[in-house]
């Protein structure tokens, strides 16, 4: 562990030195000295030197407007470099994640040692593995794509520098390259000038596939196969690829008017274009590699006389021609040209799979297994994982949009107003229409633009090649009619298959009602016939936490899942729970392994489907090696959760959780909803209003342009509190509730829950992580600089509350200090704090200057505005999660 820290620290300091030289070359000695002074003061302030802390505040307050941007950029870029070094160390031979592929081996050994599990049972669990990662374009991926590419190359340089046998001239060359990359980053604007469009976001997603997943997935499968052979003597079948990728980019229209039916159609074409592009590169390699002559009679029959001389090449060249024709047609469609479909257009995965698999079988049969299991096997696995669509997309829309569309239709038809009908009447109407053979939509009807958009989206789904759209997610789902309404709209669009429609339950009340809603649906014969024994339900983490606080939300999520699992099991339905987690704790983010093992028993039987959000995509899948490591972690966790499920909680533990939930929700809502000072305090103590100006993501920050905290999306809500280091949404209410239960004499019971119930210990672990990242002296400084004195008592009250919360969590967990069991994470937070603290102090100063100017009716100073954006991005990098 210590070797790991020292290697990380020495790389961080080397990168910092190079950045310093870059700053000196660009701006002169004076700015570098200023930055160095601030860094030293910050380090000493962190070590507890109050005089230096005061000096740090004064130095940053006294910066001229010309010095603001260079200082903000220096610390922000430093944090990006530190994150890159940390990412490298997590996969370097000395690092923590280098052992992550080992996770699979460790899991398999652990499972083999359980007397009640036979090897056959373990094999069956492997064969039923299913992992679907849903990439979402959260506005929280602050870092621009161009800087991400440079950081990937910095990572490659660090890797080569670690090589012991490197010659001096090679070392010098690598150092020169590092200097170039860091200089390029310094001279690149780190803040986007324009908001990305939904198409830009989709392209960002394709870049992740191309730069990392394309290589990472086959590498992960080789690793998995190796561990299975070694531990179970079991070989993965060629066609077995347990991992799929889906995307919300270009499909998620919930609250985002920029995602239209036309955009979705465009993104679907673009995704197919990118797939042909990547497969063409693969096939080109195979054309040059597969020069073999010997082949089975089956393969020779397939290629005929024409291809007999080089049968494998012949098939590959044919496939190449089809890919090129497909790509040309897609390009024309993307330019808006309407062309007839060419001969040999690829629309289904089988068309790619069959010629490749024929070559594979022939090579195996002719004793050339070593060749078959090379690049050809990787390409076959890519066909199974990515296929013709590259990534499938989910469509997501808010339930009220469907209700409004049907209301407009029924009013036009003169049969009443669907929107005002009771739930029973809605269901009766929907089931009648779903069973009817005649169309419901009149030909000459001219609906409003909003309704037209809903209908056009259903049209896009009906026209898309089957298999390119994964599911239709209904956000803010509350009733069975919300689900039936979507099925009716899809039927009217002429969809010819049963599209998975997943209700998303995301407020506290909706989570509590989820099981009733699904029970009612499953009791409808028509519905049971449609779903063919499979149901997907999405659990919302971020909105429930914003609605009720993190403790009440996590218990409601647990109970909703638990009840749904039991209901579906009884009804013989295979349930897939789809988890809408975010990267930050307030949005359900927890280290994957811990989070999965803390779910109710049986929650992963139908596989794992989970959203991977903006900034977390880069931390978990930014490089092929990290992809292998992340997928291995998920695999180990799913196998363990399915074969060694966590215990059912005792009744007394459930009662304690009910109690904690009620108390914490009351405390949370008492502040957030009922305290009249809370919203003005939130608006002034955090950069919430300024965040709206950042060109982040294509989605507006509010669901409705007016309205208070409740209309704010969960992401900006959490983002804002992360910036001022109070981290309030991730803990408010939880500690107070724990304290109350301790005072009722139940501390020993809480300690037992912490020891023996993964759900509860994960909750406490997440609280510790939040407290480790929070900083009360900084939160207090924001108050002093930005908040009206009349509101100071509220800030003080919240900070005192956090101090009390930390004590009670440590007492229950029996820890002397925060993160005692995860020293690597604690070390990484400490390392970054030295660079994040000055950005926080500077941000408070910039907010003060910007608001002062606004108050005095002056135009905003572009230097202040730009520096403010940089501090927001820098603190997000320092906290390693944004919203």
UniProtKB/Swiss-Prot annotation:
GO biological process: carbon fixation; gluconeogenesis; oxaloacetate metabolic process; protein homotetramerization; tricarboxylic acid cycle
Keyword list, A-Z: Allosteric enzyme, Carbon dioxide fixation, Lyase, Magnesium
Record-linked SUPFAM superfamilies: Phosphoenolpyruvate/pyruvate domain (SSF51621)
Pfam families cross-referenced by the UniProt entry: PEPcase (PF00311)
Reaction equations catalysed: oxaloacetate + phosphate = phosphoenolpyruvate + hydrogencarbonate
Keyword Cell inner membrane belongs to the record: no
GO cellular component: cytosol
Active site positions: 138, 546
EC number: 4.1.1.31
Recorded GO MF terms: identical protein binding; magnesium ion binding; phosphoenolpyruvate carboxylase activity
Positions in coiled-coil regions: none
Names of required cofactors: Mg(2+)
Consequence recorded when altering residue 587 to S: Loss of activity
Residues passing through the membrane, by range: none
Notes on activation and inhibition: The enzyme has distinct binding sites for each of the allosteric effectors such as acetyl-CoA, fructose 1,6-bisphosphate, guanosine 3'-diphosphate 5'-diphosphate, long chain fatty acids, and L-aspartate.
The protein's role, per its UniProt record: Forms oxaloacetate, a four-carbon dicarboxylic acid source for the tricarboxylic acid cycle.
Complexes and interactors: Homotetramer.
Homology family: Belongs to the PEPCase type 1 family.
Protein name: Phosphoenolpyruvate carboxylase
Organism for this UniProt entry: Escherichia coli (strain K12)
Organism placement in taxonomy: Bacteria, Pseudomonadati, Pseudomonadota, Gammaproteobacteria, Enterobacterales
């Amino acid at each position: 562990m210590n070797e790991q820290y020292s290697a990380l620290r020495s790389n961080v300091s080397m990168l910092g030195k190079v950045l310093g030289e870059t700053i000196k070359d660009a701006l002169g000695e004076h700015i570098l000295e200023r930055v160095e002074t601030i860094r030293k003061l910050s380090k000493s302030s962190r070590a507890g030197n109050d005089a230096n802390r005061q000096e740090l505040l004064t130095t940053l307050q006294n910066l001229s407007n010309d010095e603001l941007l260079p200082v903000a950029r220096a610390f922000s870029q430093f944090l990006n470099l530190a994150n890159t070094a940390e990412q490298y160390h997590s996969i370097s031979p000395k690092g923590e994640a280098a052992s992550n592929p080992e996770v699979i081996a460790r899991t398999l050994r652990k499972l083999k040692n359980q007397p009640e599990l036979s090897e056959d049972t373990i094999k069956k669990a492997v064969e039923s593995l299913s992992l679907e990662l849903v990439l979402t374009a959260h506005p929280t991926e602050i870092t621009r794509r161009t800087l991400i590419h440079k950081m990937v190359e910095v990572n490659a340089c660090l890797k080569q520098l670690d090589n012991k046998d490197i010659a001096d001239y090679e070392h010098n060359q690598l150092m020169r390259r590092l200097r170039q990359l860091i200089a390029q980053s310094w001279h690149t604007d780190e803040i986007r000038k324009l908001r990305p469009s939904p198409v830009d976001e989709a392209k960002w997603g394709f870049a992740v596939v191309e730069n990392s997943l394309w290589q990472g997935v086959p590498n992960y499968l080789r690793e998995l196969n190796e561990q299975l052979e070694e531990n179970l003597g079991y070989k993965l079948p060629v066609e077995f690829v347990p991992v799929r990728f889906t995307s919300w980019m270009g499909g998620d229209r919930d609250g985002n008017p920029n995602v239209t039916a036309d955009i979705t159609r465009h993104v679907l074409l673009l995704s197919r274009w990118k797939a042909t592009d990547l497969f063409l590169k693969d096939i080109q390699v195979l054309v040059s590699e597969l020069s073999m002559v010997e082949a089975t009679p089956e393969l020779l029959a397939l290629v005929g006389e024409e291809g007999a001389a080089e049968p494998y090449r012949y098939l590959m060249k044919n496939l190449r021609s089809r890919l090129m024709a497909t790509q040309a047609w897609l390009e024309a469609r993307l330019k808006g040209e309407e062309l007839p479909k060419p001969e040999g257009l690829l629309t289904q995965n089988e068309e790619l799979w069959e010629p490749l698999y024929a070559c594979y079988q022939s090579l195996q049969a002719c004793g050339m297994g070593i060749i078959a299991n090379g690049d050809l096997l990787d390409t076959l696995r890519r066909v199974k994982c990515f296929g013709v669509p590259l990534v499938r997309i989910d469509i997501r829309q808010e339930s009220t949009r469907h209700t409004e569309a049907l209301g407009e239709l029924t009013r036009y038809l003169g049969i009443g107003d669907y929107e005002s009908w009771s739930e029973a009447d809605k269901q009766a109407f929907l089931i009648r229409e779903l069973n009817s053979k005649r169309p419901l939509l009149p030909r000459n009807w001219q609906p409003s633009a909003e309704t037209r958009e809903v209908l056009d989206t259903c049209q896009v789904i009906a026209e898309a090649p089957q298999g390119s759209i994964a599911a239709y997610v209904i956000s803010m789902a509350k009733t069975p009619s919300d689900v039936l309404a979507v099925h009716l709209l899809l039927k009217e669009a002429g969809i010819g298959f049963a599209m998975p429609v997943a209700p998303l339950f995301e407020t506290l009340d909706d989570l509590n009602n989820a099981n009733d809603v699904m029970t009612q649906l499953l009791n409808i014969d028509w519905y049971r016939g449609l779903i063919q024994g499979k149901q997907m339900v999405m659990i919302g983490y971020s909105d429930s936490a914003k609605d009720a606080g993190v403790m009440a939300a996590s218990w409601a999520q647990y109970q909703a899942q638990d009840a749904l699992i039991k209901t579906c099991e009884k009804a013989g339905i295979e349930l897939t729970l789809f988890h809408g987690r975010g990267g930050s704790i307030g949005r359900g983010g927890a280290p994957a392994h811990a989070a999965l093992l803390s779910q109710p028993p049986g929650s992963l039987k139908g596989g794992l489907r989970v959203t991977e959000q903006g900034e977390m995509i880069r931390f978990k899948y930014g490089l092929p090696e990290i992809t292998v490591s992340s997928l291995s972690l998920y695999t180990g966790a799913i196998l363990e959760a399915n074969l060694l499920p966590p215990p059912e909680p005792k009744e007394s533990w459930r009662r304690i959780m009910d109690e904690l939930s009620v108390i914490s929700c009351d405390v949370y809502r008492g502040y957030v909803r009922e305290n009249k000072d809370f919203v003005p305090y939130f608006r002034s103590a955090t950069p919430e209003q300024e965040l709206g100006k950042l060109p982040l993501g294509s989605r507006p920050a509010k669901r409705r342009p007016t309205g208070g905290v409740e209309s704010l999306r969960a992401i900006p809500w959490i983002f804002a509190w992360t910036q001022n280091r109070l981290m309030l949404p991730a803990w408010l209410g939880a500690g107070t509730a724990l304290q109350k239960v301790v005072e009722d004499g139940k501390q020993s019971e809480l300690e037992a829950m912490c020891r023996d119930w993964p759900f509860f210990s994960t909750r406490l672990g997440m609280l510790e992580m939040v407290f480790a990242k929070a900083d009360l002296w900084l939160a207090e400084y924001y108050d002093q600089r930005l908040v009206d004195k009349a509101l100071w008592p509220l800030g003080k009250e919240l900070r005192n509350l956090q101090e009390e919360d930390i004590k009670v969590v440590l007492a229950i967990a029996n820890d002397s200090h925060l993160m005692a069991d995860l020293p690597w994470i604690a070390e990484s937070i400490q390392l970054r704090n030295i660079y994040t603290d000055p950005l926080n102090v500077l941000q408070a100063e910039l907010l003060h200057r910007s608001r002062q100017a606004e108050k005095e009716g002056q135009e905003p100073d572009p230097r202040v505005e730009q520096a403010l954006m940089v501090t927001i991005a820098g603190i997000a990098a320092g906290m390693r999660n944004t919203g």
